[in-house]
């Protein structure tokens, strides 16, 4: 049985509702959130990299299933381009939330 309570922080293409609908076949609500200590950059794809004092604005996607994460892992080319790791973000209401994030492999800093 799938876990339907997975949370993912997104900061690039997956912030687009149409892209999420195309990939997952259903609407996923996104709530504003921030990731402290990371700056967003872009080469061929968006990425975040550790940077003291930086804040990356993005969104948290809640109610994702294990199946959804597998689809998104494939889309993000895990483990070639990204890894899916746990991280803490701050929601718009100030709550600290532990969630998944896609972090780049070496391509972003090379």
Task: Spell out what each predicted region is.
Residues 1-110:
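Glycine-aromatic micro-motifs
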């Amino acid at each position: 049985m799938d876990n339907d309570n997975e949370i993912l922080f997104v900061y690039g293409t997956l912030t687009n509702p149409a892209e999420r609908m195309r990939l997952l076949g259903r609407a996923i609500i996104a709530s504003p959130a921030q990731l402290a200590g990371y700056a967003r950059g872009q080469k061929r794809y968006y990425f975040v990299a550790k940077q003291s004092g930086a804040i990356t604005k993005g969104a948290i996607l809640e109610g994702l299933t294990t199946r959804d994460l597998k689809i998104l892992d494939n889309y993000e080319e895990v483990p070639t381009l990204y890894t899916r790791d746990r991280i803490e973000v701050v929601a718009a209401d100030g709550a600290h939330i532990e969630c998944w994030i896609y972090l780049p492999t070496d391509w972003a800093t090379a």
